[in-house]
Amino acid sequence: GYSSAASDVYKRQALDAYGLPLELRYLPIIESALNPSAVSRAGASGLWQFMIGTGKIYGLESNSLVDERRDPIKATWAAARYLKEMYDIYGDWNLVIAAYNCGPGTINKAIRRANGETDYWKIYNYLPKETRGYVPAFIAANYVMTYYCDHNICPMETNIPASTDTVQVNKNLHFEQIADLCNVPLLS
């Protein structure tokens, strides 16, 4: 399974690799409640809630056999790259976080409607209702995750098991090949 401590390690690695603030590791709290199997009404999936098209742009395969949007590690690296590219465009973390929620097209439209303003709080009224609450929710999640001890909140170690599926194999395969393809050690 994926423990919260383990998930924090790969999130930190991906964010560090792209020079991103470590606070972004809390974005999946808002996106999916840290559930790698979460699916939204709109069809977004996984820890980072990628739509199929966006996932494909960032190298996440999604077909009848596999949905890499639900792979916490691959999706985290894809999300880090996406967040970096949006920061290169907007240069403002509030806008980046809002764009992660509603898409850059919606942010660009809000900026146009706000006469070119690029301050999140000045385009706030031009954003979808869900996105208006998204940035404050992210700020709140960061506060709670940083200052939980000051409020007598005790963290609990969670261990959400990885989702599994059955795949039919039509050819002979050695366990070494399967282990190699799945990138897991072969137990002796």
PLM features: what roles do these ranges have?
Residues 129-151:
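Catalytic cores of secreted or luminal carbohydrate-active enzymes
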Residues 20-37, 96-103, 142:
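Short, functionally critical alpha-helical segments immediately adjacent to catalytic or ligand/cofactor-binding
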Residues 53, 57, 74-85, 95, ...:
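Extracytoplasmic/secreted proteins, especially bacterial periplasmic and envelope-associated proteins
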Residues 29-34, 47-60, 102-106, 144-147:
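Glycine-rich, acidic and aromatic/proline-enriched surface loops and short helix-turn segments
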Residues 19-25, 29, 42-45, 93, ...:
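Extracytoplasmic
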Residues 34-41, 49-91, 111-125:
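Substrate-binding clefts and substrate-entry loops adjacent to catalytic sites
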Residues 1-6, 10:
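Single conserved hydrophobic/aromatic residue that forms the stacking wall/gate
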Residues 156-188:
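Primarily a LysM-type cell-wall glycan-binding module
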